[in-house]
Amino acid sequence: MAEGKIFTVSVTVGQETTTANLIYSKAKTYNLPLYAILSPSKVKGYIFIEAPNKSAVEEAIRGIRHAKRVLPGEIPFSEIEHFLEEKPAVSGFEPGDIVELIAGPFKGEKAKVVRVDESKDEIVVELVSSVVPIPVTVRGEYVRLISKRQKE
């Protein structure tokens, strides 16, 4: 397989995923030579497309509503590699943080983080509203941070 080059496409902010899906559909329908499409959630207004040349990317975005233009130049893989590394959902939480449970049987409840287990992607919390503190283990994606622990 030929070595792909990575190009940056400017898109409407907030429409990155939609635009990437439309480009993917067009590439599949018309058998365009695109190798990969990356729409990182942390990057607003841009998506990255791997293709053999710039003209393949320009053909893919032609007629796509929210795709504006292909930026000049290529992006080295090392610049976008960190977007591909999966971080556990519990990274960033510390004991003492106040969180809100956003899924499961305790949805909507506020809780205090007791322990974080990054290897299992789980957090042990104590519900703030309960009279007796009972530790509850929940998955990392079931919590949303409300406030960080106050440092002395």
UniProtKB/Swiss-Prot annotation:
Heterodimer composed of Spt4 and Spt5. Interacts with RNA polymerase (RNAP). The complex interacts with FttA. One of its GO terms (biological process) is regulation of transcription by RNA polymerase II. The keyword RNA-binding does not apply. Residues 95-126 form the KOW domain. HAMAP family: Spt5_arch. Belongs to the archaeal Spt5 family. The Stp4-Spt5 complex stimulates transcription elongation on both naked DNA and histone-bound DNA (chromatin), facilitating transcription through the histone barrier. Neither protein functions alone. The complex also stimulates the transcription termination activity of FttA, neither protein alone nor the KOW domain of Spt5 stimulates FttA-dependent termination. SUPFAM superfamilies: Translation proteins SH3-like domain. GO terms for cellular component: chromosome. CDD domains: KOW_NusG, NGN_Arch. It holds the Pfam family Spt5-NGN. Disruption phenotype: Essential, it cannot be deleted. It is found in: Chromosome. NCBIfam families: KOW_elon_Spt5 (TIGR00405). Keywords: Chromosome, Transcription, Transcription regulation, Transcription termination. This is Transcription elongation factor Spt5. It comes from the Archaea. One of its GO terms (molecular function) is translation elongation factor activity. It comes from Thermococcus kodakarensis (strain ATCC BAA-918 / JCM 12380 / KOD1).
